Structure formats: structure tokens, C-alpha cells
Amino acid sequence: MASRKLLLLPGDGIGPEAMAEVRKVIAFLNSDLNLGFETEEGLVGGCAYDAHGQAISDADMEKALAADAVLFGAVGGPKWDSVPYEVRPEAGLLRLRKDMQLYANLRPAICYPALAHSSSLKPEVIEGLDILILRELTGGVYFGEPKEIIDLGNGQKRGIDTQVYDTYEIERIADVAFELARTRRNKVTSMEKRNVMKSGVLWNQVVTARHKEKHADVQLEHMLADAGGMQLVRWPKQFDVILTDNLFGDLLSDVAAMLTGSLGMLPSASLGAADSKTGKRKALYEPVHGSAPDIAGKGIANPIAMIASLAMCLRYSFGLVAEADRLEAAIAGVLDDGIRTADIWSEGNTKVGTTEMGDAILAKFKALSA
């Protein structure tokens, strides 16, 4: 059996509660489906700072590099607001992304049928929505140099950020986009601002060339990023995979997430380069929601995003597509049954806590796996 090593990093706030529900699913995958997952655990974020004075220890970083995939909960909270900037809880996630060389961020936007009414858009606009935004994660304006504020000496200051992309950075993220599209509806929409940005001109040129060279079987269209934002709200179901840079991906993925009306229920994945020998990519999976310290420890957190992150892990790190499909179907089925945590509850549904929601999803998953 192939190695299936998972590192669990529950983190802070509601992270440990949500991760506890994922552990139940992994236990079933091993006991009943004999999939042989090996799990280790570590500390990240504020709890790691409390234990080690770092947002993630070197030892846990080594575990992450040795694992086939990392499942990450959430980090941060007011308890650590005054810690030094370089060891703030969020620095743990940034180090994971940097040391694991995770350059491709996958943000799905899925509308569960039972929650179509929760969107601010008309149900017919978002019913059946299933799009994937692929954001380049390690380049662009967030990392480009120079990045500084200059005192001009005349009472004025100048803020400088630099948008930089090299050909190889665009090629590798484009390859991921086309590969993902082949497993979906075979369409990529590349978004940039080539009309006003030289980096956008290069992005367009490189994606076009890469498509012609290696991925001509996939449909490709180009769209200016501002027009893309408008089209996401106008008719989002026209899209399959949206490929874009770090800045526009940051903006567009949050727009797409809110189309569903359930930002706190969505998973994400960050992938690195494929190993030349095994073809495996380093990968980290995490819910889009934060640590929600205001409800931590109360047993009311919604574990769906964390469980959906495990489904993404099964799909993209281990090729267990059927199992991922069933787990996602189990989530949808529980919502169809009217079971809700407090954050998505409405009159006429059944309000449950974290554990009850996790148990309901697991029961549905078991039934679908029988």
C-alpha cells in the first residue's frame, strides 16, 4: 500500500474542535475502508508560541515536510495580539507555505442546494454553482521588492509595492490550472490586467503559450480581472477554473466565496511542485474561516469546512476521488436533512453542535460507503 502520511495541525480557537471531527472520518477510512492513513499531530499558531516561543517549531516543520499532506485548522486570537510580529500566530502558516514551497492556492466556491437561499444573489443565479479559483500564492505584489515607505523630506511620504512575475512562476501555476480543468469541465479562464499592467501582459502571453504548447485540449479564455469580478456576480456559472495572480486571486476568491452565502463553510488547498520521481505535490489543506475565538470551546463551531478540506485532501493528494465525492455528498446530504450548526441555522431546521454535525456527516458518509 502506498504511503499515506497526514500531519494534523489543529491550531487555535475552534481549530481543535473542528479537527476532532476530521479525526473521526480518518478513523473510519482506516477501520472500515482499510486506507492506511498514518497521522501525526503538531502545534501551530498561538499554542505553539505558548509551548515553544515560535509560531511553529522546527520539529513540527520537519514533520510537515515529511508528510504527504498537512491538515491545518486555524490560528490566532486576542491572547496573542501583543506578541512580537515575527512570532505572531499567523507566522506559522506563512512559514508552512514558504518552507513547503506552496505556490498554488485552490479556493472552491460551491453552493450547497439546501443553502441556496443564503446567498445575496437570486437562487437561480447560484444554484448548482461549482467553480474553482486558482491563485498564485508566492509571487506578485505581496512579495515583490522594493516594498517600502519612503520619506520624501518635504512633508510627503511615498508607499511602494512592486508587482513582479517571472515566466516560470506563471508557467507552473498555468500547468496546475489546466490539469485541474481536465478533472472538471475542461475550461480555464485566465484573469489579469494586461490593459494597464506589464505583468498582466506577460501573464497573458505565458498562459497563451503554455496552453498552445501543452494543454490545447483544454478550453482557454482570457478576461480582465475587473470584468471577471463583475461577471462573477452577474453569472458565476459561466466559469469552471479561474486562473489568476496573487493580488487578484485574493480579491476574487473572497467574492466567489460570498456568492455561496457561506464563507465559513468552504475549504481550501495550497499545493507545491510535483516531485520529479513520485509525482506527488506537497500540500496543505485548511478551512477558509478563521479561529473564531469568541465561540471557541463552546461546542457550537461548524466543522463542515474542515471536513470538506479533508475531502480535498483525499482528492488531490491521494487520488481517492470516489471517497472524496462521497464525503462531499455526505455534507450535502446532511444539509438537505435540515441539520444546521448555529451559524447557518434558520427557522424550521434542526440546530446542532460541533460534535453532532460531525457525527451526522460521518453517519451519512458510512451509509454512502456501504
Swiss-Prot record:
Membrane-crossing residue ranges in chain numbering: none
Keyword Amino-acid biosynthesis: yes
Reaction(s) catalysed by this chain's protein: (2R,3S)-3-isopropylmalate + NAD(+) = 4-methyl-2-oxopentanoate + CO2 + NADH
Entries under InterPro entries matching the protein: IsoCit/isopropylmalate_DH_CS, IsoPropMal-DH-like_dom, Isopropylmalate_DH
GO BP field: L-leucine biosynthetic process
Site for Important for catalysis, residues: Y142, K193
Domain of life: Bacteria
Co-factor remark: Binds 1 Mg(2+) or Mn(2+) ion per subunit.
GO cellular component terms given for this protein: cytosol
GO terms, molecular function: 3-isopropylmalate dehydrogenase activity; magnesium ion binding; NAD binding
Stated role: Catalyzes the oxidation of 3-carboxy-2-hydroxy-4-methylpentanoate (3-isopropylmalate) to 3-carboxy-4-methyl-2-oxopentanoate. The product decarboxylates to 4-methyl-2 oxopentanoate.
Membership in a protein family: Belongs to the isocitrate and isopropylmalate dehydrogenases family. LeuB type 1 subfamily.
Subunit structure: Homodimer.
Listed name of the protein: 3-isopropylmalate dehydrogenase
The species this protein was found in: Brucella suis biovar 1 (strain 1330)
Gene name, Swiss-Prot/TrEMBL: leuB
